[in-house]
Amino acid sequence: KNLEQIEVFHDSILEIEMDRSFDLTLIKTVLIHINPEELDKVYSRLYKFSNKYICIAEYYSPSPVEVNYRGHSDKLFKRDFAGELMRKYPDLDLIDYGFIYHNDPVFPQDDINWFLLMKK
């Protein structure tokens, strides 16, 4: 397929620096693996790199919780990532959200909540 209009950056969200922004920034099942002490830096980058939309697709928990990940601790963290981002940047509006179900016969994935935010 021709993906000329899509630009993918294969880099660490903790290290990438650029002076560009995009119509949409998307992060999926990455925030759950970021040390909570580094989240503010990641939120800043997601916001900075977006002209208009931010889409977050992650495991959700109303309060922060650490989950054992394949026998390891300090590797998976669930929380309300979208809520935290909206509190940090009050000009973000929640315009849509949904749930991806692991037993979906057409598009199976993990049980993930997604949130589409828009800058005012």
Each model region followed by its residue ranges:
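Polar, enzyme-active/binding microenvironments
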Residues: D23
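A conserved beta-strand element that flanks and buttresses the S-adenosyl-L-methionine
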Residues: L26
